[in-house]
Each structure stands twice: as C-alpha cells, then as structure tokens.
Amino acid sequence: MKYFIVDAFTDQPFGGNPAGMVLLDSDTFPKEELMLQIATELRYSETAFVKRHSAQEFTIRYFTPKAEVELCGHATIASFFLLHRKGLASGQCLCHTKAGDLHIEAGEKVMMQMAKPRIIATIDETEDIYQALDVKNYCPTMPVQIVYAGLPDLMIPLPDVATLQALQPDMQAISEITKQLEAVSFHVFAFDNDGYTAHVRDFAPLYDIPEESATGTANASLTYYLQQCGCLGNEAECAFIQGEAMGRPSVVTTRIQVDGNLFVGGRAAVVAEGTLMIEV
C-alpha cells in the first residue's frame, strides 16, 4: 500500500494541517485494527484510507491514532489534492464516508460540500467550558453551541484575539466535557479587523489531538454558526486563519449559499510518499 503525507490548507510544505493518506490497491478495506495501527504509526491527527472506484467516485474512512471518526475535512482536502496530482481524480467527484456522501471538486484547489449543517444544542451553563480554557472574560453576546456539519463541534466565542492566543487549555477537562456533551472538539474563535473572518483554535484531546492547525469540518460548522448568529448574510464566503499558536498558520476557505449548501476547501502540499511494507 502506498502512503502519503500531505499538508492541507496551505501551498507550502510544513504549513497547514498534515494528514496521512493511504491509497488502497484492493477492493476491500483492511481490518479496522490494522487501519488503527497504521494511523498510530503515522502519528498524524487523522489518516485517510482511500478506495478508488473510478476517476469520479471514491470511498474514504478516517482514523485518528485512537479511533475511527466519521469525517475529517482536512484529510479529505489532502486526499483529493493528492489524487488530482496523481491523475486519479478530476472535476466533480463523489466521496462516500460514514458521515454521508460528499460532493467534491478536485483540482489545484479542492472544495468539498459538507453535510447539511444544524445546531444540535445551545449550552446554557458555560462556566466549566471557559474554566477549562482558563478564560475569565466571556463573550456574552454570542452563545456556546454544538454545531454539526459532519461532526459535532463546540463553538466557543472569545472577546478578542489576544485572549484566544493566550489560552492555557486544560486537556483533561476538555476531554471530559467533550465526552459528556458528545462533541469532538472545542472550536474557539475571536474576531479581528485584519481581513480574516475569524481567528480560531481547535482542541480535541478526547481523540488524541491536543490542538489542530486546520480543521475543515469545524470551520464549516463555524460558518453556519456565524450565519445563524446574524454575522453573515444568506450567502457568504469566509476565510478562517488557524494554527498560528502552533507555528503552522493555515487558511480554511468556506462558502455558504442561499440554498443552505455549505462548502469548505483550500490548497495543499504533498510532503512525502512511501510504501507500507505489510501484508493485508
């Protein structure tokens, strides 16, 4: 099996969010235990296992070093950028995932249509959430909500970018809270007048990801959240900057349409290629 390391949401190696990608050469996926072992060996936040049916149809399964997840935005962007570069995908593609079927435009910039977004819950008692971030200055005008655009993520507003960059997150507390709320991550954001829609940080220690430098799914959820809060119109394009505190700045592009369809995407850079010397 061929494997690749691809940095998503950047056009430069060692920027953006790295993902592992395994291109399968059989009609069936390996056993789950083996895919988990491979993801653990590669040590990236997510590894995508890609099965190609044709140049326009694929199936992807996603594994963190700890568990399988239904969807990973940045690993999908990375995978289709690589497939395009290898001449294995072009134009409008259909991708089957456990979160549902995704419509993807494969090219030098990859855009993927997300699952129909929805607000799962509004969290009224937020003291423990902000305490887990060591934040005392809340953002009282905007709610803390669990939003779904393929995965459930907790949207947490902060009053300014300085507070965002100075966070001292308690990973154990975040793990416990996300487990209790059945959410994947704390997706924390703040506004600034610098041309970006928002600056964001994402913490998912429950899935062995202390912090992620670019999170496609969660930023899609944030786009819908901001629209529902009245910060965006019925149709909008957004650019979220993430990963600054990690030294891996990433730009995640999103688009929400009048019909409610939601897209997320960006560029990528292929960093490495190799062969897994194992028998399936």
Q: Residues of each region from the PLM?
A:
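Active-site proximal loop and beta-alpha junction motif in alpha/beta enzyme cores
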Residues: 1-71, 77-280
